[in-house]
Each structure stands twice: as C-alpha cells, then as structure tokens.
Amino acid sequence: MAAEMRVTVSQLLKGIDRYNPENLKVLEHYVHLQVHENAYDLDANLAVLKLYQFNPAYSQTSVISQILLKALMNLPNADFIMCRCVIDDAIQQDLTIKKVILLAERLETCAFTSAWQFIKEEASLVDGVTGFHDAIRNYITYVIGVTYQTIEESLASELLGGLQGAQLQDWIKAKGWMSSDDGTIYVTNQEAHIKSKNIAEKIDFASVANIIAAAR
C-alpha cells in the first residue's frame, strides 16, 4: 500500500501543489502507512512539516511525532535534524515531541543504554512503529562497527537493547561479525582492512533536488 501510494504522493508534490493544505489528509495518511508498513519517504514527510509550518492551525502533534520517529530510524543520516528545523518552537514544547527529541539526543550522543531504558519506560511512544527497535539496533551496529574491532558479548548485548542467546547470535551472524568461545565478538571493521583505492562518486543533482527544495 505504501509503495503504491509513493508514486501518487510523488506526483502530488510536484509544482505549486506541494504546499496546498488540501493535500494534508492524503499526506498524513501516507505517514501512517509508513509507520505501519516500515516504509520511508523523507521528501513527503518534509512536505507535511512545511505545510504545518505555513498552516499552524492544521498541525497534528501525533503526525509530527511519527515523522520524527521515522527520521530517527534513519540514523546516522541527518534526517531528524532536517525535520526538526522546520518544526515551530511552540510545537517542540509539546510533551510527546519533547520526549522524541530527548530520545534523539541520547541516540545522537551514543548514550545507548540510557536510550533503551527510555524506550522501555516510554514504550507507548514507539508502539505501532513497525521496525523501530531493529532500525535503532542497525544504527548502533553501525556505531559499533566504526568504533570497535572487538567487543565483549555482554557489552554488545547491553548496547543492542538486551539481545541475548540465540537472538544475539543471529544478529552477530547477520552483521558479519564473529563470536568466539571466550565471549569476544570480532567486529567486521572496514578500517582494519585499509587498501589504497581511488574512489569516484557521482552525485545526481536530480536525486536530491526535491529534498533541497523541501528544506528551504
């Protein structure tokens, strides 16, 4: 459903209709689909936030919190910062929004144990957000990968939100790590296998033009 709607929304956001408040119902429904189907469309979500910014009376904090949570699921990319920048200060004082921002601060500063404790205490905040916990684990896995060459299983378990036993071993295997009998995990770290290489990366302006326009 979300995949099918993505095409419709993409057409809807072209030209002056991008900031037509009459499109909000469709866009808000699309946000709900992203949340429930573990889909993601940053451009559409930024358009919703912009419409709220231009039309404060239409703002819905429940939708804003969902957009922010989806942005957190895309860490370490800067989506959360981009979204927060177009949310009015008054709305950021809403209790639910403040909780999401607090969680973001803990994740962005790598206070992962504290973040998981917060998620446990505020479980209702992320209830219904499909794939949230694993998305956060993927981000933490990325941080571990650029920080450690080896890590104790007990610490990895703590950082990954309490994964233990078969769940932890499955995660280790899926990420290409290796676990030894003494409880040490050998992390696949690209920096440990540095090779001289020339990298040429082409950036297609068209692929980011919509996001740049939305962030203005």
From Swiss-Prot:
A GO molecular function assigned to this protein is:
translation initiation factor activity
Q: List keywords of the entry alphabetically.
A: Cytoplasm, Initiation factor, Protein biosynthesis
For this protein, the record's InterPro entries field holds:
ARM-type_fold (IPR016024), CSN8_PSD8_EIF3K (IPR033464), eIF3k (IPR009374), PCI_dom (IPR000717), Transl_init_fac_sub12_N_euk (IPR016020), WH-like_DNA-bd_sf (IPR036388), WH_DNA-bd_sf (IPR036390)
Residues annotated as domain PCI: 40-202
The family database entries (Pfam families) matched by this protein are listed as: CSN8_PSD8_EIF3K
Give a GO biological-process term.
formation of cytoplasmic translation initiation complex
Q: Which GO terms describe its cellular component?
A: eukaryotic 43S preinitiation complex; eukaryotic 48S preinitiation complex; eukaryotic translation initiation factor 3 complex
* Subcellular location as annotated: Cytoplasm
Family from the record: Belongs to the eIF-3 subunit K family.
- Self-association state and partner proteins as the record states: Component of the eukaryotic translation initiation factor 3 (eIF-3) complex.
The cross-references to PANTHER family, in alphabetical order and at most eight, read: EUKARYOTIC TRANSLATION INITIATION FACTOR 3 SUBUNIT 11 (PTHR13022), EUKARYOTIC TRANSLATION INITIATION FACTOR 3 SUBUNIT K (PTHR13022:SF0)
Protein name per UniProt: Eukaryotic translation initiation factor 3 subunit K
